[in-house]
Amino acid sequence: MKFQPLGERVLVERLEEENKTSSGIIIPDNAKEKPLMGVVKAVSHKISEGCKCVKEGDVIAFGKYKGAEIVLDGTEYMVLELEDILGIVGSGSCCHTGNHDHKHAKEHEACCHDHKKH
């Protein structure tokens, strides 16, 4: 099933958490905390055509009590507001890698900082 987030939102599939501790104790599913990281599966048109700070395939970190959970085709996802994303894990867009090679400083400001005005 296709899902297109609206506004400044992204669709995220949580990353699986480890099933056992470092000492080998198996953690039952009902005792595990849900991971606070996931893979972006879809971005809204407002983000893909505007900010472009987050794109499909990025691994992101987000706040513990943020977003809305939905189930699509038996898979659990989160719908998150752009402002609820804490950061991109690993390499991301120019604004999250420190590579600010925009030809114009205004382009960088528009790309990465407009969503922080809220």
Swiss-Prot record:
GO terms for molecular function: ATP binding; identical protein binding; metal ion binding; protein folding chaperone; protein-folding chaperone binding; unfolded protein binding. InterPro entries: Chaperonin_GroES, Chaperonin_GroES_sf, Chaprnonin_Cpn10_CS, GroES-like_sf. It is found in: Cytoplasm. GO terms for biological process: chaperone cofactor-dependent protein refolding. Its main location: cytoplasm. GO terms for cellular component: cytoplasm. Keywords: Chaperone, Cytoplasm, Stress response. Belongs to the GroES chaperonin family. PANTHER family: 10 KDA HEAT SHOCK PROTEIN, CO-CHAPERONIN GROES. Together with the chaperonin GroEL, plays an essential role in assisting protein folding. The GroEL-GroES system forms a nano-cage that allows encapsulation of the non-native substrate proteins and provides a physical environment optimized to promote and accelerate protein folding. GroES binds to the apical surface of the GroEL ring, thereby capping the opening of the GroEL channel. Heptamer of 7 subunits arranged in a ring. Interacts with the chaperonin GroEL. This is Co-chaperonin GroES. It comes from Helicobacter pylori (strain ATCC 700392 / 26695). The gene is groES.
